[in-house]
């Protein structure tokens, strides 16, 4: 945990409410996000119980599974879910704009610019907490390999037509959520905790009600008291006043309300199956419908408070101005969405259960690169985040006290001005360390020369590792972004009196070495493939799949 985060947490405890951890919003929030509040059944991994879903706060769609162990009812739930999510996704897939992308020419092997389609916008899925993202991944894995009756007429339990397609999309959303800075699938608790620091632990921040209680406590109540009430307060029936954000449910809800309701539904269904005439069947059908409606009411009772809190959290996030680099990261999400749309339209098979060596290495490299890029961009966008980097010795800010023109040695000398900066920060500067500042949106690099004292610079070395080694005057040599001429271009060199901020981390991340194609991968890493790969089959049917 960084020093500034610890200080903010202590300040939140002292003040009794959450403290800002950012001055701008570092994640994209769509105008019309799809909010998904799922519930699962205790005792069986991934068995859906119900959900509230929709893009309109006042008109959510309620989905429920009266008997979660019944495979047919599960498929009916997934089909309803597909009827909501897929039209929402399709509404973004058809509106495109022209864009340029660099691709390798197969004939020449050179990188060339090609014009391609890019979706003008992309869908955004919001779940209450990190566990919701895990559930989306689990749903995607369980659905994308299912076979429909059209694909396999002899399948014993064919899936509804659009269920496998929904599984592919949910898998894509879940994989994209692993990329730092992506906003296609967001856990609201994580986003709120990124922008506000509470007086509780990061694990407790996963409780959406407690987190919002710290950020916006009721009048006259401290954040700690409001959070404790959100976590523990129960009504006269012993039910939590603020149900968990899901997808797991509260044991008291399961034991006292849900289990009796499901037993009532099972009895009504058994009675309907045993009806001997039409009149008796009509009466028992009414009892079955009433039992089902009761379960739907329980699901809504458990999800509605979370639904309202998710929209409250989105309203809080919208009060913050968007960071300068958020649009750039959202554009990468749009490229990702467009690429998956094209793969689906091209008829490619579902994503495999396990990535091959090259794909896995590429994913890991992408995530590492995007994490470094996100850390740098958040600091450049937000003075409060930059303050944390300065406290950590990874950046420094100060006033330019002197600029001395100097030139490089060689046949064609280039300008290499020496800039002296007075700072109160204590950056971790080593010999010839690089520093960077933002100049017109591009990074300008400089080299650490040494600490200056009484106007004379001391050459930096291992022993010159802080202001105590030579005072708080830092001498830097500007290296680039000054034009091609003998004299620097106007505005490219700092002037005396300028207030600057230099970072010791790079602002832009370079791509790594290109990995071989799967056909060229050594056998030690899973290749080359001996025969053509075949589409993966669904998970085997177990006793738990059928009631």
Task: Describe every region a protein language model picked out.
Residues 430-434:
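Loop/turn positions that initiate beta-strands
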Residues 115-128, 133-142, 146-346, 444-474:
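Alpha-helical structural signal
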Residues 42-47, 131-136, 405-410, 427-428, ...:
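Flexible loop/turn segments at secondary-structure boundaries
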Residues 1-122, 135, 142-176, 180-181, ...:
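Long, charged/polar, low-complexity intrinsically disordered N-terminal extensions
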Residues 435-440, 445-448, 453-454, 458, ...:
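C-terminal effector modules of nucleic-acid-centric enzymes and ribosome-associated factors
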Residues 7, 284-429:
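Accessory interdomain/linker segments of ATP-dependent helicases and helicase-like nucleic-acid enzymes
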Residues 50, 416-419, 472-474:
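Short aromatic-glycine-enriched beta-strand elements
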Residues 38-42, 127-130, 423-424, 439-440:
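Structural motif
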